[in-house]
């Protein structure tokens, strides 16, 4: 049985705005996230985890931030590409575990909608998508409220 695990990590700083987009869900907040695309740190991290499991590098290799066509792009484009690559190589994504690290906004009230959005985008059962959050106990840049970090793991199984 061919099982692959991939890990992803990403960070985005807070900047001007009135919401953040996480897992494709708009969450009201006094600031936005800064990035070349829509700065969906969670979706970027899951995308990188899938590319990692496939040994295909990272999101920046497939969608370079130096390429103006990706300016402001919706991150589901990137995630759908990674999911398609897995399928083309004969893999099914067994499950995804995504952990957001931030003091705010509070993720709990939005976690179910985030899971549902990711399941829809990835074409997976909701029971195979985990989205959760923790804080850094007010340490580091996330603890100071300067941005959001995210880690994710994706498990792929040869179909």
From Swiss-Prot:
Pfam families: YgbB. The keyword Acyltransferase does not apply. 4-CDP-2-C-methyl-D-erythritol 2-phosphate binds at residues 10-12, 36-37, 58-60, 134-137, 141, 144. Keywords: Isoprene biosynthesis, Lyase, Metal-binding. NCBIfam families: ispF. Signal peptide: none annotated. The record marks 36, 135 as: Transition state stabilizer. The keyword Metal-binding applies. It catalyses: 4-CDP-2-C-methyl-D-erythritol 2-phosphate = 2-C-methyl-D-erythritol 2,4-cyclic diphosphate + CMP. Its cofactor is a divalent metal cation. A divalent metal cation binds at residues 10, 12, 44. It comes from Roseobacter denitrificans (strain ATCC 33942 / OCh 114) (Erythrobacter sp. (strain OCh 114)). PANTHER family: 2-C-METHYL-D-ERYTHRITOL 2,4-CYCLODIPHOSPHATE SYNTHASE, CHLOROPLASTIC (PTHR43181:SF1). This is 2-C-methyl-D-erythritol 2,4-cyclodiphosphate synthase.
């Amino acid at each position: 049985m061919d099982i692959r695990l991939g890990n992803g990590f990403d960070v985005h700083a807070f900047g001007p705005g009135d919401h953040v987009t996480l897992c494709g869900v708009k969450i009201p907040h006094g600031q936005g996230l800064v990035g070349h695309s829509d700065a969906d740190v969670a979706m970027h991290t899951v995308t990188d985890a899938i590319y990692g499991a496939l040994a295909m590098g990272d999101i920046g290799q497939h969608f370079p931030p130096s390429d103006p066509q990706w300016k402001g792009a919706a991150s589901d484009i990137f995630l759908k590409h990674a999911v398609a690559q897995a399928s083309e190589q004969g893999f099914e994504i067994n499950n995804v575990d995504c952990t957001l690290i931030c003091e705010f906004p509070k993720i709990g009230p939005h976690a179910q909608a985030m899971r549902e959005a990711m399941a829809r985008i990835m074409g997976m059962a909701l029971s195979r998508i985990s989205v959760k959050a923790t804080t850094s106990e007010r340490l580091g840049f996330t603890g100071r409220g300067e941005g959001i970090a995210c880690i994710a793991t994706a498990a792929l199984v040869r179909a």
